[in-house]
């Protein structure tokens, strides 16, 4: 089997139906789908939907019930353990999939045959983000030599394709941040650190839907990157500069943009989404982000980072914005400036 597709989101029966229907209509059927059901109140309805597709998919449709701690990354590790495809990728049930998606993904995975194949991410829904290419990554990189990839790879799991031989290397990885999101940041970098060959393609293969119930907790994200930094210092000391740059790119730019630039329609017109956003992207969290970044900006570590990190010496938009004080940065359209 060529491909294992993993959906970490199984919250709504209607979304699961549309997702499985779109997979049934794929031009290339050389894949399996591993579906995580992670909402107990919807489980009965979701299983009824799944039954409708068992005759078509047979053993190619595998269902996992949410882990005890509800961690996306724990669920992803469980899916990795049973994945049979030569390549593995995350495709969530709340995102629409074109009928050529699998064929294109498999063709590119076979053509480049790298440990990690990354596509341009495209976020839609409550967050709209279509970033430009962050650096010239238009070749196959040897990650033992080309450290730049670790600074500029996007911190998401859902825009990448991994070799099965790579995902098997993180089955026993001890995930320290269980208060996570569908981005799976810690496991994403754990995979990158184990990889040997990498390729970036500057076009989107799919659009990732960001719903209103995505928690954006600044302290949880900071903890994730602190864990990554600790691991890198211990096991990959030559990548310290790259991971530190990745940390501040996410914490100061992306997270600030995600918290402050929620798409207007969801914020004001959809009742359920409005209620979710008032909780999960509330002024309390925005203020926590403000306090956290003000503290970071005054720290000796950040001051040294600004002046000496090699990626901060590169003259580009994102390095300039990282240098900018949060009090002025927060009034910018950060996500637009990164496009």
Map each language-model feature to its residues.
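Donor-binding/catalytic cores of nucleotide-activated saccharide
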Residues: 96-190, 194-197, 211-216
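Nucleotide-sugar-dependent glycosyltransferase catalytic core
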Residues: 179-180, 200-230
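Cell-envelope/extracellular polymer assembly enzymes that use nucleotide-activated donors
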Residues: 2-6, 32, 186
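Acidic donor-binding segment of Leloir-type glycosyltransferases
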Residues: 20-65
